[in-house]
Amino acid sequence: QRLGHQWAVGHLM
């Protein structure tokens, strides 16, 4: 998994 993906998911959600 990518760190950027985690924060990105929170922003999109």
Curated annotation (Swiss-Prot):
Superkingdom of the organism of origin: Eukaryota
One GO process term, biological-process aspect: regulation of insulin secretion
Transmembrane segments: none
Record key words, sorted: Amidation, Amphibian defense peptide, Pyrrolidone carboxylic acid, Secreted
Entry-annotated residues carrying Pyrrolidone carboxylic acid: Q1
InterPro entries, A to Z: Bombesin
Entry comment describing in which tissues the protein is expressed: Expressed by the skin glands.
Chief localization: secreted
Compartments, record wording: Secreted
UniProt entry tagged with the keyword Secreted: yes
GO molecular function, one term: hormone activity
PTM-bearing positions, type Methionine amide: M13
Cellular component GO terms held in the UniProt record: extracellular region
Physiological role: Possesses insulin-releasing activity.
Entry's family note: Belongs to the bombesin/neuromedin-B/ranatensin family.
Protein name: Bombesin-like peptide 1
Species of the source: Bombina variegata
